[in-house]
Amino acid sequence: MAAPSGRSQSSLHRKGLMAADRRSRILAVCGMHPDHQETLKKNRVVLAKQLLLSELLEHLLEKDIITLEMRELIQAKGGSFSQNVELLNLLPKRGPQAFDAFCEALRETRQGHLEDLLLTTLSDIQHVLPPLSCDYDTSLPFSVCESCPPHKQLRLSTDATEHSLDNGDGPPCLLVKPCTPEFYQAHYQLAYRLQSQPRGLALVLSNVHFTGEKDLEFRSGGDVDHTTLVTLFKLLGYNVHVLHDQTAQEMQEKLQNFAQLPAHRVTDSCVVALLSHGVEGGIYGVDGKLLQLQEVFRLFDNANCPSLQNKPKMFFIQACRGDETDRGVDQQDGKNHTQSPGCEESDAGKEELMKMRLPTRSDMICGYACLKGNAAMRNTKRGSWYIEALTQVFSERACDMHVADMLVKVNALIKEREGYAPGTEFHRCKEMSEYCSTLCQQLYLFPGYPPT
């Protein structure tokens, strides 16, 4: 066979370079985020020792993270440790969605403690998130499940598609505006002290998968709320702790452990966010048993949590407080409000309403997704109305507005929303959030100030 000519060799070389360039560009688009890779690396030994793969691999296969050939390659390794190592070698090469899908699979296979470990590490790594392009959309395709009024609709960029709006992969755009030195100097003397680094500890507890005899459904969209809040609190300067799918007893025990952490002594505030099904005065564990909110507040009161005495404590409750859907009333001579097209669901439990008293505590403020007796609305793709509004307001106005006033703005956003789910009880439904406060001073979060 004749040797290739110089021209042929040059052509082959160019084609090889083009192919390499294509592979490079594909990896740039499809590779795992560096923070996710670093998170897996930092927990590699623990994961290699503790992962239980038999069911986990099926979940990853279903999510198109691994192929049948990859599953066979992993299973061909001798011993669980070697199999786990092989999976950990593959994951960083399986695209930008692989980390989130892996975390979800851990949760679905009752390995939530490993997911918590990964998310806590990720929060520690992401001290400062780079700003993302963010603007507001004025029109949305009908296929989007739920939206704010058009002028409030967040999107990724000017050419965002409908998939980027409701794929549930996390907050579409989140950037907290920093407080200016001038604003801080003008307000800090009349407000709670908020200067510690971190500002305080934050706990985000999200129950999504329920078992037991209660008729409590999977909280589709709950993962979006969790991811959004973890990101928001991190950007506001908090050290975030995460918990998933806890029984009522586990919630009580872990909330108590969180309240007793020594770090509260040297920080200036505390945040607790609880996301679950609920009734008036209580929230459900994944076992269908109730944890009374009275008990939650008791754990952080002045008697039981002296480390937080005279410090502001913020609570956010995304759960129903009853099972009544607010049908709303016609507004006299009112403007036509844009509907919120969506796959609406309710966080109400399917049992008789339980009445529980809510105690008054000092230096606390608690935001509720809905009024007493009512159900809270949650979109199966975008997450709950309340958490979406809370995130929008806090990211935009924490720089120049105190928390109580921000919660008033959250109320205003929730008031404008209207469900869109033709043929269901949630079509044209309404929701009204509220808050109660025993704060004794103005509570400014002063994001980004003083500079670290």
From Swiss-Prot:
Pfam families: CARD, Peptidase_C14. The gene is Casp2. Residues 2-169 form a propeptide. It comes from Mus musculus. This is Caspase-2. The CARD domain mediates a direct interaction with CRADD. The modification Phosphoserine is found at S157, S340. GO terms for cellular component: cytoplasm; endopeptidase complex; nucleolus; nucleus. Its EC number is 3.4.22.55. The active site is at H277, C320. Residues 327-349 are annotated as: Disordered. Changing C320G: Loss of function. The mature protease can process its own propeptide, but not that of other caspases. It catalyses: Strict requirement for an Asp residue at P1, with 316-Asp being essential for proteolytic activity and has a preferred cleavage sequence of Val-Asp-Val-Ala-Asp-|-. High level expression seen in the embryonic CNS, liver, lung, kidney, small intestine, and hair follicles of vibrissae. Moderate expression seen in the skin, oral mucosa, skeletal muscle, submandibular gland and thymus. In the adult, it is highly expressed in spleen, lung and kidney. Moderately in the brain, heart, testis, liver. Low levels in the thymus, skeletal muscle, ovary and gut.
